[in-house]
Amino acid sequence: KVKILLIKFYRVFILITKDIIRDKVYELYKEAVIVLGDDVKESLENALKIEEHDLAKLNIEAILKNIELAEQKGIPMCQDTGLPVVFVKLGNVEVENLRQGIEEGIKKATEEIPIRPNIVDPLSRKNTNINVGDYIPPIDIELIDEDYLEITILPKGFGSENNNAMKMALPAEGIEGIKEFVVI
């Protein structure tokens, strides 16, 4: 489900406004949750061709049909779109209100696509209903010595991270005890 999209704004002696950033972030986020990369689709189609078990084939067929319907109807492939993670490469360009533009693009996508509002305040547990909040989305900014601004959006799904386990190993269990726990 991981899809990374980016947009580059090259320096052409203009101000990259908050509104430009908002609109591009909206477009990127929308595409990221609706359109799956051709390489992933091809991998699923290849898996379907070589799969021998009927139940597994049915599941792969259902996934491929879901991908097709999402693109046709313009709706997210999965109801769990997770957390939008934003990566920015900021070069020698003039940018207006970068964080605000990103947050407004995420909010617009949440309301218009629509995307399920997943984000809650870490202390109150109150849902923001717009997928933005204090330090959300996380934005990683890398300063570069180039003449462009690049924005990449990665919808980080919450599903796979729900499965975890912890064990306090006894010293007598040694490495074998650790291996046994990890392999289980």
Report residues per predicted region.
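Short, Lys/Arg-enriched N-terminal segments with co-localized hydrophobic residues
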Residues: K1-I14
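Non-transmembrane, aqueous-exposed alpha-helical and coiled segments at domain scale
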Residues: I14-I184
